[in-house]
UniProtKB/Swiss-Prot annotation:
Region (Disordered): 170-189, 543-597
Domain Peptidase M14 intervals: 202-522
Protein role: Inactive carboxypeptidase that may play a role in cell wall organization and biogenesis.
GO terms under biological process: cell wall organization; proteolysis
Lineage summary: Eukaryota, Fungi, Dikarya, Ascomycota, Pezizomycotina
Cysteine-cysteine disulfides: C333-C356
Protein name: Inactive metallocarboxypeptidase ECM14
Segments of skewed composition (Acidic residues): 550-561
Keyword Hydrolase in record: no
UniProt keyword list: Cell wall biogenesis/degradation, Disulfide bond, Glycoprotein, Metal-binding, Secreted, Signal, Vacuole, Zinc
Cofactor annotation comment: Binds 1 zinc ion per subunit.
Length: 597
């Protein structure tokens, strides 16, 4: 049990009192037409008093949606609660939008779909060499099909038939249950296991995340520090946690890893996952020898969202907003894609010159304010703070992929390709042994599905959007970070960006184990770390004590240990049912020992 000094306790109490005296954050701006309230019960139900953090979360939901305290709905979890219709404001904004998946076979099909999506200004959700997911209104479907070759007119399937309803169910629901677990919202001295911490039972708005980060740092000051990377276009801090224990007399450059999420505002699972990994490392220090060793050897910079303006906008106005919120040359098309604005090979595919495009990278390199702030921060840390950045992990969604450089072109290979692939394969296997989830491994230029079923088709490398100017390429090429990856998290399309909240903890476990594998790889084969029981540091799935580092295949298990699944999946095409539970053969994914020192 952790002991706090008298001064720390007083500071903590003062902080909590400040929050409890503030029912909501008045600095937030809320939509002009909030969602209509939906009543769960027809008659009044007695309620137990709600605790501090639930009141804080409820106040955010009430202010955003305009829901009176006595008329809170319990949407956001259709697996446990009865379904409710999406409010009129969501129907008005998203209409009868759907998400369709198109299967791709030839380069001509890719080219036709690229041209059609640009003509109709469609929202491309995800793309690989096998399929492309596109959001569009139902009444636009005939126009799209009319622009496509016959081969594509019959090879599309619906992934989301009712987008407003799915969006409505993705928002967290204000709790009306007794507050017996309220203390679970606060950081504790125990590492997170399963869903014991209420913070990870729902996606959280920025106005809850930032106080939580500050409190976490105040409770573990020996190895956690709350910092700001810079300021966003709208003046918000870009919050981060620095986690690590640096020896007082160590004059060597401090090896540092960056774990970042939320570049694209609508990808909420990346934000929650960064927080989960940070929480797990911080609360496990001193209890797990492998984790303690990592924090003594490295600093970790956790940035839940580099795009705070966009993230707030997804909570208050448009759940599917992708870019940041800065002004462009067209007043009616604001925002810059923060993963297409970096300086290396900026706008490499020459398709991002239209501010209305989702992948618009700005009118010059580093036009995106927040990307420029992060680039300047890492330069300052290197030049003035004796820091050496050795790894970069950028969390996105969706499609379950582990991508390494380069993104801008498939014609060039990174010099340490073998090492990048080896580590990526080790990360993929650690994830698969966590929750039976298969993550593809590929170069980011194609975003290929590494199913091992067929070889990549170079002629299909024509992309649906610009892939130049990515953070992945800049950190690797211009900044010299040897191990740079982009992880596209769950799922493979059943929910896309609207991943249900039940996936927060399982996805967090997967990426936590990925970070552990990354740290183990970076420590290398030094004799000083030979005796560490690395498996003790990994988070295991429920009802399974199989070691994460076991090199044996485990392909005979086809169940989901986390119990995550869709109860009503009758509308899903048969070929996509259980697409998150496929457990394909390892192929060549064994964690090889071939890297060159």
């Amino acid at each position: 049990m952790r002991l706090f000094t008298h001064g720390q306790v007083l500071a903590l109490l003062a902080f909590v009192n400040t929050i409890s005296a503030t029912p909501s954050f008045s600095t937030n701006s809320y939509p002009a037409h909030p969602a209509e309230p939906v009543s769960l019960f027809s008659q009044h139900q007695p309620q137990a008093p709600l605790g501090l953090w639930t009141r804080l979360r409820n106040s955010v939901i009430e202010r955003v949606w305009g829901v009176p305290p006595q008329q809170r709905h319990r949407g956001g979890n259709k697996h446990q609660y009865p379904p409710f219709s999406a409010p009129a404001s969501l129907r008005a904004r998203y209409g009868d939008d759907v998400v369709l998946r198109f299967k791709l076979q030839t380069a001509d099909e890719v080219k036709a779909l690229v041209e059609a999506s640009n003509i109709l200004f469609l929202d491309v959700w995800s793309s690989t060499d096998e399929w492309i997911d596109i959001r569009l209104a139902k009444d636009v479907v005939p126009s799209l099909l009319g622009l496509l070759p016959k081969s594509l007119q019959t090879t599309h399937v619906p992934l989301i038939r009712d987008l407003p309803q799915t969006i409505y169910e993705s928002y967290p629901s204000p709790s009306q249950s007794p507050s017996g677990r309220e203390r679970g919202f606060l950081p504790s001295g125990e590492p997170s296991s399963d869903v014991t911490n209420i913070f990870f039972e729902n996606y959280q708005p920025l106005s809850v995340i930032v106080p939580w980060m500050r409190l976490l740092a105040s409770m573990f000051p020996s190895h956690a520090q709350f910092i700001s990377i810079g300021s966003s276009f709208e003046g918000r801090d870009i919050p981060a946690l620095r986690v690590g224990v640096r020896p007082a007399n160590d004059q060597k450059p401090r090896r540092t890893l960056i774990i970042e999420g939320g570049s694209h505002a609508r990808e909420w699972i990346g934000v929650s996952t960064v927080n989960y990994v940070a929480y797990s490392l911080i609360t496990s220090y001193g209890k797990s020898k492998p984790i303690s060793t990592l924090l003594e050897q490295f600093d970790f910079i956790f940035i839940p969202t580099i795009n705070p303006d966009g993230y707030v906008y997804t909570w208050e106005t448009d759940r599917l907003w992708r870019k940041n919120r800065q002004e462009t040359s067209l007043p009616f098309c604001p925002g810059v894609d923060l993963d297409r604005t970096w300086g290396f090979e900026w706008n490499g595919n020459a398709t991002g010159d239209n501010p209305c495009l989702e992948s618009y990278g700005g009118d010059k390199p580093f036009a995106g304010v927040e990307a420029h702030q992060l680039a300047e921060w890492v330069k300052e840390q290197t030049e003035q703070r004796n820091t050496k950045f050795v790894a970069y992990m950028d969390l996105h969604s969706y499609s379950q992929q582990i991508l390494y450089p380069y993104s801008y072109s498939c014609l060039y290979q990174p010099p340490n390709l073998e090492n990048l692939e080896e580590l990526a394969m080790g990360i993929a296997k650690a994830i698969r042994l966590t929750n039976r989830k298969t993550y593809a491994v590929s170069s980011a230029c194609g975003g290929l599905m590494a199913s091992q079923k067929k070889k990549a088709k170079p002629e299909t490398f024509l992309r649906m959007e610009s892939t130049g100017g990515s953070a992945l390429d800049w950190f690797y090429h211009d900044f010299g970070v040897k191990y740079a990856y982009q992880l596209k998290l769950r799922d493979r399309g059943s929910y896309g960006f609207l991943l249900p909240r039940e996936n927060i903890v399982p996805t967090g476990k997967e990426v936590f184990n990925a970070v552990m594998m990354l740290g183990r790889f970076l420590l290398g084969e030094s004799n000083a770390f030979q005796e560490l029981d690395w498996d003790a540091g990994f988070q295991r799935p429920k009802k399974d004590d199989k070691p994460i580092l076991n090199d044996d295949d485990d392909d005979d298990a086809d169940t989901n240990d986390d119990g995550i699944g869709r109860k009503d999946d009758s509308w899903i095409p048969d070929e996509y049912k259980g697409d998150n539970d496929r457990d394909e053969s390892d192929g060549g994914w064994a964690f090889r020992r071939l890297r060159k020192r």
